[in-house]
């Protein structure tokens, strides 16, 4: 039988293909219709999410499916999708997209792995230093935290640049090679 069913997040595809805007929501539903099958996020596109919302939604899905959702992240190459959400796609501004993606991934892994955390970067100030119930908020906690720690994370390997490979190693992210990436020489550079 099958072990894992993988699907990709895509938006605004009026042509009628790749029309799954929320993998986590779909996988929670499918997990309740199956007994053992795992579901792979191939991939949640970071620049179309706030990293804390993605972390919360994955953690909830992890609990509701009893650990049957495999987390995956991507940078976003469809300009129609990513740019519509107000962020740079790899097709329009690759450098800005990578910078945003890397910071979002840092926030995700802090949220998953630290009991409480803060992050002050170029794009995110988490939490904002605001008064809260009589004190200044300095850190937050992801609630719920993922059921399964450490979170297994996958990412597409497209360019196989040294920077991309080093980034994946830093966070223990596993790579998937397929589609156009495999025909573009990535397979030879990685293997």
Regions found by a protein language model. Give the residues of each.
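Active-site-adjacent structural elements that line small-molecule/cofactor binding pockets in enzymes
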Residues: 2-191
